[in-house]
Amino acid sequence: MTPTCDGGTATITGFFGGTFVFNEAPTDGAVIDSSTGLITGGDYNTTYSVSYTTVGGCPTTTIISITSVEDDDSSFEMTPTCDGGTATITGLAGGTFTFDTAPTDGAVIDSSTGLITGGDYDTTYSVSYTTNGDCPTTTIVSVTSIIADDSSFEMTPTCDGGTATI
């Protein structure tokens, strides 16, 4: 048996034509294909006991335990910047960042780092991060860019220069 994200896949090394069943019925919704042994619909990181019984004059049964693979951790955090945000991956690195909803203000996202640039301040962006491991998952986080400081001022002319009013 080869583990998968929601169960496992069987490889028959003995006689073909037998029947696969769970040795103990799972309570997580997993199902097994009786002819191929493919387990689907289960939970990650769960152990299943599977029996394979051959048919014929002298049937035999083999019981194998298999533990499904754990889903990738796609968690990340966004820190706002003036024109977007920066991402910090807290889960599995090496995935891909995209905008969950495409912005209309010219903002772009670096697919490797999650850095958003070229956006407007005080704008909310929805960012998606998808892992590329054995059991890919996606997390979506929103970030609102920082409101830019007001740097405007006025100058009043005087005889020896000027006076600034902020």
Positions of predicted regions on the chain:
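Append "Rare intracellular matches occur via the same short Y/T/C beta-strand/loop motifs
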Residues: 45-56, 122-133
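Proline-enriched interdomain boundary motifs that mark the N-terminal boundary
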Residues: 1-3, 70-80, 146-155
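Short beta-strand/loop motifs in extracellular/secreted proteins, especially
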Residues: 16-20, 48, 93-96, 125
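Low-complexity "stalk/linker" and mucin-like segments enriched in Ser/Thr/Pro/Ala/Gly
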Residues: 19-36, 96-113
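Short, exposed coil/turn segments at beta-strand boundaries within extracellular/luminal domains
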Residues: 54-61, 132-138, 159
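Short beta-strand edge segments in extracellular beta-sheet folds
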Residues: 63-69, 140-148
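Extracellular/luminal low-complexity segments enriched in Ser/Thr/Pro
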Residues: 37-46, 113-122
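A short beta-strand segment in extracellular, disulfide-stabilized domains
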Residues: 6-14, 83-92, 162-166
